[in-house]
Amino acid sequence: MSAAVAAPARTRLTHLQRLEAESIHIFREAVAEAENPVMLYSIGKDSSVLLHLALKAFAPGRLPFPLLHIDTTWKFREMIAFRDRRAKELGLELIVHTNQDGLAKGIGPVSHGSEVHTDVMKTQALRQALDTYKYDVAFGGARRDEEASRAKERIVSLRNAQHRWDPKRQRAEPWHLYNFKKRRGESFRVFPLSNWTELDIWLYIEQENIPIVPLYFAAERPVVERDGQLIMVDDDRFPLEPGETPQQRQVRFRTLGCYPLTGAVESPAATLPEIIGETLAARTSERQGRVIDKDGAGAMERKKQEGYF
């Protein structure tokens, strides 16, 4: 009588492995349904993780979509250098789009304020690019834990022909089943990192040794204090107030955007373990340094309804 064959032991995935598997599944499902997909690449830590997951999802082949960066011309210089270096290292197709009409009018965060700048140089610019290249699926790195309006958005988010988001038209997503049916002119924003947290992102960056912009690590940087925010003076376009002089302070950034609209935090965290330790102890959102989130009640939801990332 033959001996009974023991059933194979069940492999228990770690928390990060489950998140990784979900994100890869989302990428593959969306690409299978898409006619012309693209990945929105904003150069920050979430975009770096998103790109890493996309490369894993379609390895050993090339990415089946290009990267699209909406360049407001006001990003930190280190961000642009990092973007160009990574695209070259990985052999990626990178499309950079700037709203030329807004550029010609001199629209900027200092001269016109955060709300006008964000609308013209980010939202309108993104809509222009999506229309020009006729993308029907755009991957983004937004996470639900970042902000209230993002918390209620679906992983597969339907946008109308004007790229607007209607929270009342969201679709159910039971058992990781996603509905990609759409009418002519409609499109989708797809968020593979929806269920990740800021801590998950940092733990995964450490685990996978993912390159990120050096601005996330503490260093001596020239900053001025404006409205309770430490703003880094990244170039000579930033106007100093009478008697104001940039001070060298040890700071880093929890989130990155246009430099006049992004506040730094004082911190000694110069390594990934130190950043993870700070994240564990944090009692405020990483987006506390984003000036655009303070453009009135419901600012982010209103921006998203207008077509923002």
From Swiss-Prot:
It holds the Pfam family PAPS_reduct. Gene3D superfamilies: HUPs (3.40.50.620). This is Sulfate adenylyltransferase subunit 2. GO terms for molecular function: ATP binding; sulfate adenylyltransferase (ATP) activity. It catalyses: sulfate + ATP + H(+) = adenosine 5'-phosphosulfate + diphosphate. One of its GO terms (biological process) is sulfate assimilation. Keywords: ATP-binding, Nucleotide-binding, Nucleotidyltransferase, Transferase. NCBIfam families: CysD, PRK05253.1, PRK12563.1. InterPro entries: PAPS_reduct_dom (IPR002500), Rossmann-like_a/b/a_fold (IPR014729), SO4_adenylTrfase_ssu (IPR011784), Sulfate_adenylyltrnsfr_sub2 (IPR050128). SUPFAM superfamilies: Adenine nucleotide alpha hydrolases-like (SSF52402). It comes from the Bacteria. Disulfide bonds: none annotated. Heterodimer composed of CysD, the smaller subunit, and CysN. PANTHER family: SULFATE ADENYLYLTRANSFERASE SUBUNIT 2 (PTHR43196:SF1). Pathway: Sulfur metabolism; hydrogen sulfide biosynthesis; sulfite from sulfate: step 1/3. Belongs to the PAPS reductase family. CysD subfamily. With CysN forms the ATP sulfurylase (ATPS) that catalyzes the adenylation of sulfate producing adenosine 5'-phosphosulfate (APS) and diphosphate, the first enzymatic step in sulfur assimilation pathway. APS synthesis involves the formation of a high-energy phosphoric-sulfuric acid anhydride bond driven by GTP hydrolysis by CysN coupled to ATP hydrolysis by CysD. Coiled coil: none annotated. The keyword Nucleotidyltransferase applies. The keyword Membrane does not apply. Its EC number is 2.7.7.4.
